[in-house]
């Protein structure tokens, strides 16, 4: 049934769109954590220099600790509905992006992105001492690399979903056109059948009228 298949395509497209929204939420969380890491690196560079004293360095360390806590909070609270996206929970998601029930209509994605402070290795960083500040730089650089891998993974999924959505749009347009042609053909056939029936009905009426006229003409001749 073309109409039923088309309705399925519309819902599949909505599923693909929602899946894309989930990925965008994940990417948004990673982007904020990336900003935190960049700021941590700035503070590390600043604290590693003798341009500032111990007191100023302690103030910088307070900001560092707050930033680490915020990055960890973002990772643990970024959700799409009830699904946690950046805490490494590893839940496998299934996106049904086709009008049929077989596996070819499903995109599976395992949510293994873990951007928590402990996973990124930034949970114990400090800039209270110059040595700690210099160590922080290497730690943050490694964290940025790991974060980049996660963002690349989400980007690949987003690209696939975009392709899927475009393909669903094309299928929907083609099926809609086919359904319209079939419907027009059915209407044309019904119109032709109706016209044919009307012609037959008119012919039958004409024959009956002629049949009724014949006896009357005979009686007139006899009289």
What are these regions (language model features)?
Residues 1-223:
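Primary detection of the long, small/polar-rich alpha-helical "axial" segments characteristic
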């Amino acid at each position: 049934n073309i109409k039923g298949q088309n309705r399925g395509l519309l819902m599949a497209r909505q599923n693909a769109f929602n899946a894309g929204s989930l990925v965008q939420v994940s990417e948004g969380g990673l982007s904020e954590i990336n900003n935190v890491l960049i700021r941590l690196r700035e503070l590390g560079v600043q604290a590693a220099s003798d341009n500032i004293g111990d007191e100023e360095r302690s103030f910088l360390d307070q900001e560092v600790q707050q930033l680490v806590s915020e990055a960890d909070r973002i990772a643990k609270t970024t959700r799409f509905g009830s699904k946690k996206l950046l805490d490494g929970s590893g839940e496998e998601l299934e996106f049904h992006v086709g009008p049929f029930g077989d596996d070819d209509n499903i995109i599976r994605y395992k949510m293994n992105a873990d951007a928590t402070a402990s996973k990124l290795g930034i949970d114990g960083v400090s800039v209270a001492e110059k040595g700690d500040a210099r160590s922080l730089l290497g730690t943050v650089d490694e964290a940025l690399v790991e974060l980049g891998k996660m963002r690349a993974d989400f980007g690949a999924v987003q690209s696939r979903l975009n392709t899927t959505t475009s393909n669903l749009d094309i299928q929907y347009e083609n099926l809609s056109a086919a359904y319209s042609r079939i419907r027009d053909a059915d209407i044309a056939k019904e119109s032709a059948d109706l016209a044919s029936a009307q012609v037959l009905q008119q012919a039958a009426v004409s024959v009956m009228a002629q049949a009724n006229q014949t006896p009357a003409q005979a009686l007139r001749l006899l009289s």
